[in-house]
């Protein structure tokens, strides 16, 4: 029995055009692409020259900067063991089980929280800081130095926070479960305002100012411990603010919602600074 052919049906197809003459870079871009899947922001990072440069810088330190989902998973075990062995000092900030792979999306999130002093927006919408996201061009523009320190150092601080109980399901107090990025923000606020006494713009223009701090883990550990003590005061202030919000008529705020919208408002910033002083 013959089947009737369907009439022509209009449709659409997504086409990605890669304008890159270097074969190695082309292969990097296409290696993990699956034509059946939609292109996501975290995949488009592979198309960004800025992040390719960061990957090269971090590889010299023994870390794999994963620009594209699957990059680390599909890397040969011999390459992992030979090229990505970590750094003698920087590994002290990381959990013992860390694989020396740094997700670009996590690093971006940490940079916005630390260097740009904004913990709430990257917490509430990680995707907005990916390529073509609403906030990407506000961060990645010609005013941002292509320097691994701007991404790597905030990532190290978030990783350190995990070693002291931040981001865990059973974290106590409960706020610690949601406060990894807030810890990053608090650390860099203390570092910028009270230790280096530099503005955000000055640090962005000269990221090397951060290196002596991070290369001296023992001294920096004291600042990290101090930040943790300040966060204990912050959690008390946050609890009061949280309770006040929920006491308002027709207001129901979860801790997730709190850290997405209220955790770094002007009053809580002022309170944190007062504890430091």
Model region roles, listed by residue range:
Residues 1-3:
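A sequence-level detector for short glycine-anchored, His/Arg-bearing signature motifs
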Residues 9-13:
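Short glycine-/polar-rich loops that comprise or flank the Walker A/P-loop
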Residues 17-181, 185-195:
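C-terminal catalytic or substrate-handling cores of phosphate/nucleotide-
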Residues 171, 175-176, 180-277:
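C-terminal accessory/interaction regions of large nucleic acid-associated machines
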